[in-house]
Amino acid sequence: MERRSFLKKASVGLAAGAAAGVASTAAVAAPAVQTGLPEIKWRMTSSFPKSIDTLYGSAELLANRLREITGGKFDIRIFPAGEIVPGLQALDAVQQGTVEMCHSCSYYYVGKDKTFAFGTAVPFGMNARQMDAWIIGGGGQELLDEFYGNYNVYSFLGGNTGVQMGGWYRKQINTLEDIKGLKIRIAGIAGEIMSRMGAIPQQIAGSDIYPSLEKGTIDAAEWVAPYDDEKLGFYKVAPHYPTTTRRAGGSRARWCTSM
């Protein structure tokens, strides 16, 4: 199954479960519309640019699905990164009540607490299927609920990216010496590992990566995988794309709402 299809179906199924309280998938063509519901209008800020139709598109599918199965009673308006708040401040926007919901990757916030990484991915950790097993059947969601409760936020699954690549580089990387002093956009604990190898990790939102590479502000960038990376045009300014590095076996995006 294509990753794009899986991510979108995961979002649709999640939406149906959240709103209707029943198991559902994207294959259900005409779900029963719930009646007698209050009108709810939420705003969701995304950490992703609108051009990424897998990540940003999954948020649109969620909103459309909820709108459909509630007869328009539950309406979520989605805003791309930078429109309300910068992409890396999505969680803060929920905490502060600026928006009711966000779609983000929790490892963007390891600067607050490294535990946030376990909601998305850690280097050499679980792949997407193992993450699902842990979160859904292994007590992972309960542990994350307890952790996120400290931030007055509730978080739940929002699709996954699948295996991620090693990043795009302006120069070829052949030895560890080539990594020393390298300014690379990379998120989560992986950035800390790169730092110990001599690189200089940078936290940059997705929509700002291309101009940073083009101007030489950074020397390399890790984002997602070929389909998403091509959308942002990294290959035009950073032609080296090694596949020998496997950092994240299945990064999890997450929906976060205020408690």
What do the predicted segments below correspond to?
Residues 2-131, 143-259:
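N-terminal secretory/targeting leader peptides
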Residues 138-139:
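Core domains of carbohydrate- and sulfate-ester-processing enzymes
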